[in-house]
Amino acid sequence: YIKDNKIDMLGEPLPNEDLDLQLIWLHAVETLGAKAVNAASLGEMWIGLIPPNWNEYGIGKNNMRRGLIPPLSGDYENLWKHSNGAWIRTEIWACCFPGMINKVTQMAFEDACVDHGFGEGTYAAIFVAALEAVAFFNNNINDLLEIGLSKIPESSRVSRSVRLVMDCYEK
């Protein structure tokens, strides 16, 4: 509660939507089964279970309420579709499907496209999910980066940026 303009959670941890989203996605896998989890089912959970409405979250939810289905929900009139909200919630997919690169990148896409459409935010989620899934079995950072890069378009800003950093590091 708020008292004297200060938040007092009485010793309770503060909510963290990045963790909360991953717990809801785990709930989706457990209740629907991995094969039934897709952008549409995740979109329904966004609307029913996820309170924040800021930035890409709000745009995606409002677009779904208007009748736009993912990935259009994350793409239409979304100034934040290139932001980082999706890749920071990919750990759950890597933990559910370790080493299963094709499955984990599909799940990252299904998740990210709801609020990031076809933007760079979706490419970032796919890139990160792929390297996280492989990291269970391979700790070579260059291998991980190359595997992640192999799953996104070379022309994407994410790919170009990662390759630029890798080149700078090499030099």
Question: Can you annotate each of these PLM segments?
Answer:
Residues 1-171:
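Structured, active/binding-site neighborhoods that engage oxygen-rich ligands
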